Curated annotation (Swiss-Prot):
Belongs to the MtfA family. This is Mlc titration factor A. The lineage of its organism: Bacteria, Pseudomonadati, Pseudomonadota, Gammaproteobacteria, Enterobacterales. It is found in: Cytoplasm. Gene3D superfamilies: Collagenase (Catalytic Domain), Glucose-regulated metallo-peptidase M90, N-terminal domain. Involved in the modulation of the activity of the glucose-phosphotransferase system (glucose-PTS). Interacts with the transcriptional repressor Mlc, preventing its interaction with DNA and leading to the modulation of expression of genes regulated by Mlc, including ptsG, which encodes the PTS system glucose-specific EIICB component. Shows zinc-dependent metallopeptidase activity. Binds 1 zinc ion per subunit. Interacts with Mlc. Keywords: Aminopeptidase, Cytoplasm, Hydrolase, Metal-binding, Metalloprotease, Protease, Zinc. GO terms for molecular function: aminopeptidase activity; metallopeptidase activity; zinc ion binding.
Length: 265
């Protein structure tokens, strides 16, 4: 029998966080009880160590806080919470937000423009999110804003900037880069055939190696059935890095559901 970490003494019941309800989102239903228990333990520590800051009138209750923490900790379920040491605050807007962006063109002219962002991950600063896209991250759909921004944080542990290559043994870097760029080229070829909106993998993955790693991390956890068969070699590298196999979880859950259906009388 599993001893759930959120089942506290009766005297402390009033302050217990709603972990069981927080776990009820589709993305987390494939986890075993042991994995869910481990994830909650990490999420409790995450909420103790990080500050969630609601902005522009957004209301942050305990259930929302728990679900945000669970999604932050899913990628580091086996890596450990220390992999999220690079920031202390999570800023949360109610919806996508406008930022001032500065960029330099091919001839060296600097341009400024205002753009709408869903999230940001500052190298030596906070992660910035918005609640509308966080809610869309609860489903197993291939989109997950929190996992995307966490992937950027994991990526930058390997150096000063995100490169698409997380902190892995040096002997594996060349193979990782080869498979990642092959995936980018494959996605770009599909985009050229069907267009950005019709591509089966988010077209943003073809824009940059760091974005490819972040986007495919979203698919790794929330749509493994799309990632694994298309890029099997890169899939194995992701499994080795994250020390998880979401496709195996999905198959296990589907097998359980099929068994239950055949035994209904």
């Amino acid at each position: 029998m599993i001893k759930w970490p959120w089942k506290v003494q009766e005297s402390a019941h009033q302050t217990a966080l709603p972990w069981q309800e927080a776990l009820s989102i589709p993305l987390l239903t494939c986890l075993t009880e042991q994995e869910q228990s481990k994830l909650v333990t990490l999420a409790e520590r995450f909420l103790q160590q990080k500050r969630l800051v609601p902005l522009q009138g957004f209301e942050l209750d305990s259930l929302r806080s728990c679900r945000i923490a669970l999604l932050f900790c899913l990628p580091v379920l086996e890596l450990g919470l220390e992999w999220l040491d690079g920031f202390h605050e999570v800023l949360i807007y109610p919806a996508p937000f406008v930022v001032d962006d500065e960029w330099e063109d091919d001839i060296g002219l600097v341009h400024n423009q205002r753009i709408v962002q869903s999230g940001q991950s500052w190298q030596q600063g906070p992660i910035v999110l918005n609640w509308l896209d966080i809610q869309d991250s609860f489903d197993a759909s291939g989109f997950n804003l929190i996992i995307h921004e966490v992937a950027h944080k994991l990526d930058t542990r390997n150096g000063d900037r995100a490169s698409g290559v997380p902190f892995i043994p040096l002997r594996e870097v060349a193979g990782w880069e080869h498979d990642l760029h092959a995936a980018m080229n494959n996605i770009q070829e599909e985009i050229e055939l069907v267009g950005d909106n019709a591509a089966s993998i988010d077209a943003y993955a073809a824009s940059d190696p760091a974005e490819c790693f972040a986007v495919l991390s979203e698919y790794f956890f929330s749509a493994p059935e799309l990632f694994a068969p298309r890029f099997p070699s890169l899939w194995q590298r992701f499994c080795q890095f994250y020390q998880q196999d979401p496709l195996q979880r999905l198959h296990r859950t589907n097998d359980t559901d099929s068994f239950s259906a055949t035994n209904v009388h």
